């Protein structure tokens, strides 16, 4: 049977580019992380999937509504759901706790989470337990989902330049092309 669609594949590779794991059920925002010998990713039906890299057994783990986007640090997985709620998931016991609202798009950078979206569209900096550090909504071109940290600044590339600010949302600026 001929179809008009195509199937996307994601490959987990080792340092020598050998395929360790392959999956075809990729979510809208491709993300993957290896924590404690397990590979985690969001599948095409918005579930967080855990794959044991020794046995290659996989299972969906709790996601309190559909997982929309995810990021991680060295200890936890953070994910937002369709209701713009931000959760912190422990890979050890697979438990999740809600830490914030209005965080559809986000990025985990060092000790802070840079979030935006939700009903009010505000941009908020949270600590990793959900405490609000600052509102950076006035930083027009600072995107939460594409933020990256270099030394003591957060940067985002936008159409026309680079936006930057201090880790706490202060001293916002833009460099234009």
Pin down the residues of each PLM region.
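Residue position within the beta-strands of beta-propeller blades
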Residues: 1-2, 40-42, 78-79, 114-116, ...
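Small side chains
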Residues: 10, 32-33, 70, 115, ...
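Repeated scaffold domains used in trafficking and secretory/extracellular systems
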Residues: 26-36, 65-74, 101-110, 139-151, ...
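Generic structural signal for coil-to-beta-strand starts
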Residues: 18, 38-39, 47, 76-77, ...
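Peripheral, non-catalytic segments that deliver or gate enzyme domains
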Residues: 25, 63, 77, 108, ...
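Eukaryotic tandem repeat interaction scaffolds
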Residues: 87, 100-109, 113, 117-122
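Surface-exposed loop/turn elements that mediate protein-protein interactions on large endomembrane-trafficking
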Residues: 5-24, 47-62, 83-98, 121-138, ...
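Short loop/turn segments that connect beta-strands within the blades of beta-propeller domains
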Residues: 6, 35-36, 44, 73, ...
